[in-house]
Design a protein with these regions (language model features):
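A short, active-site helix/loop in glycosyltransferases that binds the activated sugar's phosphate group
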Residues: 69-70, 115-150, 223
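Conserved acidic donor-binding segment of nucleotide-sugar-dependent glycosyltransferases
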Residues: 293-301, 309-314
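N-terminal subdomain of nucleotide-sugar transferases
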Residues: 1-27
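C-terminal amphipathic helix plus adjacent low-complexity
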Residues: 318, 323-386
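Conserved catalytic-core segment of nucleotide-activated headgroup transferases in glycan assembly
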Residues: 2, 6, 16-17, 144, ...
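Acidic donor-binding loop of glycosyltransferase active sites
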Residues: 56-57, 129, 247-261, 274
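Acceptor-binding helix/loop patch of EC 2.4 sugar-transfer enzymes
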Residues: 83-115, 172, 182
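Short hydrophobic beta-strand element within catalytic cores of glycosyltransferases
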Residues: 265-268, 275-279
Length: 386
């Protein structure tokens, strides 16, 4: 979201960030970057008054559930506003993969067609004028599996411009293994379980002096119970400085068995000059045709072997670090895609009616969804008054 805010500000847009969520001590100070914040309420006509008065040129929905809640109100009150959906990742892809892992069955893309979440998510994509997709693989899924018109999609990955290669620690200055990820995110919890039960015991047998450091916000009791100082498996909880944690580690381990989108931890490891060992799910959408900054292994025996090799062999480690820099420079620098995005926005603003006419299914869905959601929302609003 901060990346998008910066892009719009670069084009001269004033930004208003409206949210129904409660702020926490860890919320980003948007006012420090000249963003106006507004508290909004679910299922309330007060949003209609707010959006009418604001009369925005562009409305960006942060994930499809927000579009479900507020999209029809934007449609009714600001019909000429360009509606953009920031998908972050395809929730249906992540959840369908998760379900396959839990059932111990192979995942097939056709499984998505039976997903209720996919139906909601794709409906949201169709209702919006443009959907931002951060993974090339997900662009392919939307176009080939769901037959979404490419004109409704725009590839806009995470950007990583700051690589201070000369200021990074070298092989001998770094130590230990690290994993980092929010524990409210199920793929992260599953990955830590795999580390604890299947991967770390064997790595520790071969590298008894190494420690496995686990960082992540919102660790539940079941996560904290995995902490074992004797086994050198350390649960730290939230990292005060995530970049510092990754910079100091010799290797990042990410045995992701399911997920979607781009794994920020792996891109941040590249930026920090820290090689990684992950799975094909972890590397998805990141490496393209470039060599990984370490190893990609789905088989855990091979995963363990490559983690030990990377930890011990300086030449392989150095080459892996360089591979990560190459991936970031050639695939994730902002100047590779930010102007394309801004040009696309300007084009759509100038050709909005024609663009919408070419998306008849989207207009049909918007019409009927607006009616059904509207009356459900009004029923909730009236119920709350009682």
């Amino acid at each position: 979201m901060l990346q998008l805010i910066a892009l719009f500000q670069k084009k001269g847009f004033a930004i208003v960030f409206a949210s129904a969520a409660q702020e926490s001590d860890f919320s980003y100070d948007l006012k420090s970057i000249n963003v106006v914040t507004k508290k909004i309420v679910l299922n309330s006509n007060s949003f209609n008054d707010f959006i009418n008065e604001l009369n925005p040129e562009i409305v960006l929905f942060d994930r499809f559930v927000i579009e479900e809640q507020f999209g029809w109100r934007v449609y009714e009150n600001c019909p000429n506003a360009l509606r953009i959906l920031d998908t972050e990742d395809l929730h249906s892809l992540r959840l369908t993969r998760q379900n396959a892992v839990k059932k111990n069955i192979a995942f097939e893309l056709s499984d998505l067609l039976a997903s209720d979440i996919a139906k909601r998510e794709i409906a949201s994509v169709l209702r919006c004028d443009l959907s931002l997709i951060i993974s090339e693989f997900e662009i392919k899924v939307l176009a080939e599996t769901f037959k979404i018109d490419p004109n409704l999609l725009h590839y806009l990955p995470l950007s990583y411009d700051f690589i201070l290669e000369n200021e990074l620690l070298d092989f001998h200055q770094k130590k230990d293994f690290v994993f980092i990820g929010n524990f409210l995110h199920e793929p992260n919890w599953d990955a830590v379980k795999q580390l604890k039960e299947k991967i770390w015991p064997e790595i520790r047998n071969q590298l008894p002096d190494a420690t496995m450091h686990i960082y992540g916000a919102y660790p539940s009791q079941k996560v904290l119970q995995l902490h074992n100082k004797k086994e050198k498996f350390i649960i730290h909880g939230r990292a005060k400085n995530a970049n510092e944690v990754i910079v100091n580690a010799k290797i990042l381990l990410a045995p992701m068995r399911f997920g979607a989108g781009l794994k920020g931890k792996l891109l941040e490891a590249m930026q920090a000059g820290t090689p990684s060992v992950t799975t094909n799910i972890g590397a998805e959408g990141i490496k393209g045709n470039y060599n990984w900054n370490g190893f990609v292994e789905d088989d855990f025996l091979a995963f363990i072997s490559k983690a030990v090799l990377l930890y011990c062999e300086e030449a392989i480690w150095n080459e892996s670090q360089k591979n990560g820099f190459e991936i970031l420079k050639n695939r994730f620098k902002s100047d590779l895609f930010e102007n394309l995005f801004l040009d696309r926005v300007c084009f759509l603003q100038s050709n909005l009616e024609n663009h919408r006419n070419l998306n008849f299914m989207g207009r049909l869905l918007l019409h009927h969804t607006a009616l059904s959601t509207k009356y459900m929302s009004r029923w909730i609003e009236e119920k709350n008054r009682l």
